[in-house]
From Swiss-Prot:
Catalyzes the conversion of 1-hydroxy-2-methyl-2-(E)-butenyl 4-diphosphate (HMBPP) into a mixture of isopentenyl diphosphate (IPP) and dimethylallyl diphosphate (DMAPP). Acts in the terminal step of the DOXP/MEP pathway for isoprenoid precursor biosynthesis. Pathway: Isoprenoid biosynthesis; dimethylallyl diphosphate biosynthesis; dimethylallyl diphosphate from (2E)-4-hydroxy-3-methylbutenyl diphosphate: step 1/1; Isoprenoid biosynthesis; isopentenyl diphosphate biosynthesis via DXP pathway; isopentenyl diphosphate from 1-deoxy-D-xylulose 5-phosphate: step 6/6. The active site is at residue 126. GO terms for molecular function: 4 iron, 4 sulfur cluster binding; 4-hydroxy-3-methylbut-2-enyl diphosphate reductase activity; metal ion binding. NCBIfam families: ispH_lytB, PRK01045.1-2, PRK01045.1-4. This is 4-hydroxy-3-methylbut-2-enyl diphosphate reductase. Gene3D superfamilies: 3.40.50.11270, 4-hydroxy-3-methylbut-2-enyl diphosphate reductase, catalytic domain (3.40.1010.20). Binds 1 [4Fe-4S] cluster per subunit. The keyword 4Fe-4S applies. It catalyses: isopentenyl diphosphate + 2 oxidized [2Fe-2S]-[ferredoxin] + H2O = (2E)-4-hydroxy-3-methylbut-2-enyl diphosphate + 2 reduced [2Fe-2S]-[ferredoxin] + 2 H(+); dimethylallyl diphosphate + 2 oxidized [2Fe-2S]-[ferredoxin] + H2O = (2E)-4-hydroxy-3-methylbut-2-enyl diphosphate + 2 reduced [2Fe-2S]-[ferredoxin] + 2 H(+).
Length: 309
């Protein structure tokens, strides 16, 4: 069997930074260290940090006053920040810097009274945090997921609009929705191209590059990982059978009946150790040749807060 490993795959700079923030806080301060929401959407990573003394909560009312709390890579609303300050919580912010860029755009629109449209998935913590940057009743913030949502959208002033996107969506994910917005609202302002999350786009490009060369695609990532699900969907759109697995235990040998070529990748929140375990499990099924497929080099590094260095 030929096993192709897509590149780049796995941890991005934002995930590396978020995990490092929790690890350094655990080293420098006595547990418990509270983390609002899963710091990244991966079961293995979260369990590892729990075992070391991190306590994951969904709301700040689960955190004792004057405790240390870390905001997840997905970001939080302004209301959450205000509550943390009011209660005297010591905050370390693990929000991905690329998410923060989107937050600043929404906050700027709010200050200017420009209505803002967010392209994203309802219920995702990043979406909730981004929409929570807007607090100007003179304008408004709207969430759309599809061209149909755009068709049904009603705004106050069609000539005073901007849009932003959830960072775990690539340009390809949002093309149709953006086209619908620009068709309906010709004067709408969008983000600059350099605001696109490089990691999301690179991992999707890597899947696209490999998908047509294999009969089966395995994506390593947790079910609540938005970007991992997008990778699986992209492989399927290319006509390749694809499965999302948390770890090697999820790999079903029946998937490989008659398969000669399989590809493996990992979402941005999945560690390489899980990829290795999955590849090892596949290689045990038949004599295998493992090939690293060349891809775009990533050298972005995001620094942790100065107090944790």
């Amino acid at each position: 069997m030929n096993i192709l490993l897509a590149n780049p795959r796995g941890f991005c700079a934002g995930v590396d930074r978020a995990i490092s923030i929790v690890e350094r806080a655990l080293e420098l301060f006595s547990p418990p260290i509270y983390v609002r929401h899963e710091v990244v959407h991966n079961r293995y990573v979260v369990q590892n940090l729990k075992d070391r003394g991190a306590v994951f909560v969904e709301e700040l009312d689960q955190v004792p006053d004057e405790s240390i709390v870390i905001f997840s890579a997905h970001g939080v609303s302004q209301a959450v920040r205000h509550e943390a300050k009011r209660r005297g919580l010591k905050v370390f912010d693990a929000t991905c810097p690329l998410v923060t860029k989107v937050h600043l755009q929404v906050a700027r629109a709010s200050r200017k009274g420009i209505e803002c449209i967010l392209i994203g998935h309802a219920g995702h913590p990043e979406v909730e945090g981004t929409m929570g940057q807007y607090d100007n009743p003179a304008g408004g913030v709207h969430l759309v997921e599809s061209p149909e949502d755009v068709a049904n959208l009603v705004v106050k002033d069609p000539d005073n609009l901007c849009f932003v996107t959830q960072t775990t969506l690539s340009m390809d994910d949002t093309t149709d929705v953006i086209a619908s917005l620009q068709s309906k609202y010709p004067s709408i302002e969008g983000p600059r191209k350099d605001d696109i999350c490089y990691a999301t786009q690179n991992r999707q490009d890597a899947v696209r590059n490999v998908a047509e060369k294999v009969e089966l695609f395995i994506v390593v990532g947790s079910k609540n990982s938005s970007n991992s699900n997008r990778l699986r969907e992209l492989a399927q759109k290319k006509g390749t059978t694809a499965f999302l697995v948390d770890n090697a235990d999820d790999v079903d040998p029946s998937w490989f009946n008659g398969i000669q070529h399989v590809a493996v990748t990992a979402g941005a929140s999945a560690p390489e150790v899980l990829v290795k375990q999955v590849v090892d499990a596949i290689a045990k099924m038949a004599p295998s040749v493992i090939t690293e497929v060349e891809g775009r080099l990533e050298d972005t590094v995001f620094a942790v807060p100065a107090e944790l260095r």
